[in-house]
């Protein structure tokens, strides 16, 4: 994921900053506690496509 896209994209729930996790191919919203998947280079920024982040993941 290119930095220029990360500068533009925000969490659709909180409108907050997202973190790119290359190893999991996800964009994380710590504020919403959601991880949005990236499939074939395309971020799926729908709340119903996201998975809930676990407490252990949020500590990292």
Swiss-Prot record:
It comes from the Bacteria. Pfam families: Trm112p. One of its GO terms (cellular component) is cytosol. InterPro entries: Trm112-like. Belongs to the UPF0434 family. This is UPF0434 protein NMCC_0628. It comes from Neisseria meningitidis serogroup C (strain 053442).
């Amino acid at each position: 994921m290119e930095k220029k896209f990360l500068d533009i994209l925000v969490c659709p729930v909180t409108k907050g900053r997202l973190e790119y996790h290359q190893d999991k191919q996800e964009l994380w919203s710590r504020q919403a506690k959601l991880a949005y998947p990236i499939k074939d280079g395309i971020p799926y920024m729908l709340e119903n496509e996201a998975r809930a982040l676990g407490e252990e993941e949020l500590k990292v």
